[in-house]
Design a protein with these regions (language model features):
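N-terminal secretory signal peptides that target proteins for export/translocation
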Residues: 1-22
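Bacterial N-terminal signal peptides
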Residues: 25-37
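Bacterial Sec-dependent signal peptides at the C-terminal "C-region" and cleavage site
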Residues: 35-45
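A short beta-strand-turn-helix
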Residues: 47-67
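Structural microenvironment flanking redox-active thiols in thiol-disulfide oxidoreductases
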Residues: 80-120, 128-137
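Short, internal strand/loop/helix patches
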Residues: 117-158
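Thiol-/selenol-based redox modules, centered on thioredoxin-like
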Residues: 155-156, 160-208
Length: 208
């Protein structure tokens, strides 16, 4: 059967030129959706810092070991009173547990921290947490508070070190419970950790 005139055939053929804007638009939409699906760049994430200013991950070097983060301030009286106990516990468990002091105050410079460690006899490594990356991860609110993570780096306990302080300025003659010590033993043995107990001390600035 004879075909129609060439002009009739051309009238029903899709125009490539008219399809181009739609194709470009769809390509841009797909590209935008793919970008939104990508995880945030690691450089944009909050991070703790070593005292030399380099990014720090206290869990990275502690593969297979529990991690203990103890949050302190250079100018918090209660935090400073706990220094001998913190140092003693870190020395007791240091071979089996990764211990870190964490300074969440933005005002705590590396030199202030080094001086604070000298003044209070600290021998354990320290980190700065001005962006509160570790504060958020550990769910702490005051200094001093501790966070204990098991060997798989799951948070087991966060809160007070012991119950020595009833309130700010009110202390017992001696502590009757020892949450940090109990939590570390739980992390090492696989037993049930103590219940999270709020700390008594100096509020971390952004959480006041």
């Amino acid at each position: 059967m004879p075909s129609g005139p060439p002009g009739d055939t051309l009238m029903h053929r899709p125009s490539l030129t008219s399809q181009q804007p739609l194709s470009i638009f769809l390509s841009l939409v797909v590209a935008a959706l793919l970008l939104l699906a990508l995880p945030s760049s690691p450089t944009a994430q909050k991070t703790a810092l070593h005292l030399d200013g380099t990014p720090a991950d206290p869990f990275l070097a502690a593969s297979g070991k529990p991690v203990v983060l103890v949050f302190v301030r250079t100018d918090c009286p209660i935090s400073n009173r706990y220094a001998p106990l913190i140092q003693r516990i870190s020395s007791q468990y240091g071979a089996r547990v990764a211990f870190w002091l964490v300074y969440p105050s933005r005002m705590a410079s590396a030199e202030k921290i080094r001086q604070h460690e000298r003044d209070y006899g600290y021998k354990l490594p320290a980190l700065r947490d001005p962006q509160h990356a570790l504060v958020t991860q550990a769910q702490v609110r005051v200094t001093p508070e501790a966070a204990v993570f098991d060997a798989n780096h799951r948070l087991l306990y966060h809160g007070r070190i012991d119950d020595l302080y009833v309130d700010f300025g009110r202390a017992r003659p001696a502590a009757t419970t020892h949450e940090l010590d109990d939590a570390i033993q739980a992390a090492l043995s696989g037993k049930t950790p103590p219940r999270n107990m709020p700390g008594v001390g100096c509020f971390i600035a952004d959480l006041e």
